[in-house]
């Protein structure tokens, strides 16, 4: 049996995320204009993600520029959450595991 609270630290496939200590921001901003980098360059996006370390809004891996993944790699911020309405899952780019915080 897992210790209390262990379930929220495990991904949907049972793999634990080892970067939970990087989570600083959980809640989405009240309004999101779009992917910050796409807005600056005139790019387009499919879905949005929010870095849970610094709050930067980037586009998903289905988007042409994959700015959320690029940000994770360049800044070392491993975890992003979905910024889509009604979604509360997060993703660790390093451990490649999805999970829900809370």
What would you call each of these model-derived segments?
Residues 1-8:
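Extended, low-complexity, charged intrinsically disordered regions
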Residues 13-23, 29-34, 41, 57-102:
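Cys/His-rich, Zn2+-coordinating zinc-finger modules
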Residues 43-52:
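Canonical RING-type zinc finger of E3 ubiquitin-protein ligases
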